[in-house]
Amino acid sequence: GIKVGVVDLVMFRPFPADLIGRVLQGRKGVVVLERTDQPLAVDLPLMREIRGTVSKCLENGRDAKRAIYPDLATYRELAEAPPLYSGSFGLGSRDLQPEGLIGAVENMLPEGKRKKLFYLSIDFLRDKAVTPKQEAYQQTIEDAYPEVRELAIKGSENPNLMPPGSITVRF
């Protein structure tokens, strides 16, 4: 099995950089999932804070005598800073499915695609267009943005986690 942990951030401000820096230290990979998208930003909001925290922890490791940011962890080597992956989900009110979480983890694995920025539970282009008009629209999009199909990540499976006999109703 794969050893996976979850940090559920319930409050964004003040940002718990002290705790995040310690939790992330030495991890093999960290995926940050955010229910937002900011296409022209360098990073999504939470990833920006986490990247800033990791950077400050690395700065602490530069000076062996004193930490520049005493409340934060000290990363003495670059290897103590985990690779960071940023995922966006829930766009267009789409539900995050188990398949998306599986895909986010599989992306970080050595045999995974290792995309640094990706989207879950959304297809920008359908594999097979429903109508000729949709096919023309999709071709126009793909011509203008050839990499758009690669932005979405899918997991290898989508297990049904509902209890036996239950149904899902969406309003």
PLM regions and their residue ranges:
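A short acidic (Asp/Glu
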Residues: 16-19, 41-43
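Short acidic loop-to-helix transition motifs that present clustered carboxylates
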Residues: 9-17
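Peripheral docking tails and interdomain loops at the edges
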Residues: 33-158
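Catalytic phosphate/nucleotide-handling subdomain of diverse soluble enzymes
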Residues: 19-21, 25-28
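General small-molecule cofactor/ligand-binding pocket signal
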Residues: 5-7, 85
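A short, charged/proline- and glycine-enriched loop
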Residues: 162-169
